Amino acid sequence: MIYKVLYQKDKIQNPRRETTQTLYLEAPSAVEARALVEKNTPYNIEFIQELSGNFLEYEEKSANFKLTTF
């Protein structure tokens, strides 16, 4: 599955919508996606969304869509 991960760059500052960033990740489950991001980055994860069907098609059309690999 492909997951959209919304995050803040660090865990020190309070989350603000204006500074939320996104990465896309392929993982077997949302739990494993979270574990991968937590293991490989200092990011503060806000939300993980599974993408499929029309949602995935829409995101793939975005210029920012790029699968992250660790």
UniProtKB/Swiss-Prot annotation:
InterPro entries according to UniProt: RpoY (IPR009907)
Reaction(s) catalysed by this chain's protein: RNA(n) + a ribonucleoside 5'-triphosphate = RNA(n+1) + diphosphate
Gene Ontology MF terms: DNA binding; DNA-directed RNA polymerase activity
Enzyme Commission code: 2.7.7.6
Biological process, per Gene Ontology: DNA-templated transcription
Keywords in alphabetical order: DNA-directed RNA polymerase, Nucleotidyltransferase, Transcription, Transferase
GO cellular component: DNA-directed RNA polymerase complex
HAMAP family the record matches: RNApol_bact_RpoY (MF_01553)
Complex formation: RNAP is composed of a core of 2 alpha, a beta and a beta' subunit. The core is associated with a delta subunit, and at least one of epsilon or omega. When a sigma factor is associated with the core the holoenzyme is formed, which can initiate transcription.
Free-text function comment from the UniProt entry: A non-essential component of RNA polymerase (RNAP).
The family this protein is said to belong to: Belongs to the RNA polymerase subunit epsilon family.
Record's protein name: DNA-directed RNA polymerase subunit epsilon
